[in-house]
Structures are given as structure tokens and as C-alpha cells.
Curated annotation (Swiss-Prot):
Family (UniProt): Belongs to the bacterial ribosomal protein bL31 family. Type A subfamily.
Swiss-Prot/TrEMBL cofactor(s): Zn(2+)
Gene behind this protein: rpmE
Protein name in UniProt: Large ribosomal subunit protein bL31
Keywords, ordered alphabetically: Metal-binding, Ribonucleoprotein, Ribosomal protein, RNA-binding, rRNA-binding, Zinc
Length: 71
């Protein structure tokens, strides 16, 4: 690698809005704030909600189906 052209790889602190602090390394060079992390993201905590589409697929198929065809 050429010397002097690559950014410095420094240790930074990523702080989540839930209070979790993660130490990592980055070329960014400054600490960052996160909205979600592995401790508070709904997918990882098991508190994920299922969004009910309420028959939207059936409504779409009804609107755009070709008349005279059956499955």
C-alpha cells in the first residue's frame, strides 16, 4: 500500500439512543450516535410487530385479475 494516502483507522464510540455504548474502529474519526442497536431493535428483541395488510392482496388481485380466468 502507498504510504500517506489512506485515512487513519481510529477507535470510536457508537452510542445508541437506548444508552448502549459500542466501541469499534472506523475511518470516520469521530464518535457517532445511533438510533437503534442490537439491544433495542425490535427484530433482535423479539418485540417485532406483524403489520396486517387487511386483505390488500385480495383487493389487488380482484382489481387487476383478467376476467374469465380461474386458478
Amino acid at each position: 500500500m502507498k504510504q500517506g494516502i489512506h485515512p487513519e483507522y481510529k477507535e470510536i464510540t457508537a452510542t445508541c439512543s437506548c444508552g448502549n455504548v459500542i466501541k469499534t474502529r472506523s475511518t470516520l474519526g469521530k464518535d457517532i450516535n445511533l438510533d437503534v442497536c442490537g439491544n433495542c431493535h425490535p427484530f433482535y428483541t423479539g418485540k417485532q410487530r406483524v403489520v396486517d395488510t387487511g386483505g390488500r392482496v385480495e383487493r389487488f388481485n380482484k382489481r387487476f385479475s383478467i376476467p374469465g380466468t380461474k386458478k
